[in-house]
Amino acid sequence: MKKRNLMVALLCSMCLAVSSPVPAMADGTKVVTLGADLTQDQKNTMMNYFKADSSQVQVITVTNQDERDLLGNYVPSEQIGTRTLSCAYVKPTQSGGIKVRTANLNYVTCNMIATALSTAGVNNCEVVAACPYEVSGTGALTG
């Protein structure tokens, strides 16, 4: 199982590195990705959970089509599902490597997210990937 997760993480990160549909984060820019299928109340809950102010972060909406475009060849369709709900908060740092923590994700792991960021050239950041309730986390990985 660990070998399979590592393989999925590597494949996802390669896919993300070459075909990301969302703007790349500039050095020092904090980014929040929100699942397109969250209600406004759920989006507000996630922004509060991340302690992020929408006027001070770049907010990107991730759709189920984004997930399918980026992960469809590597992640089982039943893990991607039909709605995008998970979110991520990325805060660039000056040192310390890539630190990831998750909440309510049952498929995507911290290692998958860290590998995708590393492959995309990110060296130092803090990431929180989460959802208001348990989901696979492919939306957060896509973001």
Regions from the language model: what does each represent?
Residues 1-2:
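N-terminal secretory signal peptides that target proteins for export/translocation
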Residues 118-142:
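Amphipathic, coiled-coil-like alpha-helical scaffolding segments used for oligomerization/assembly
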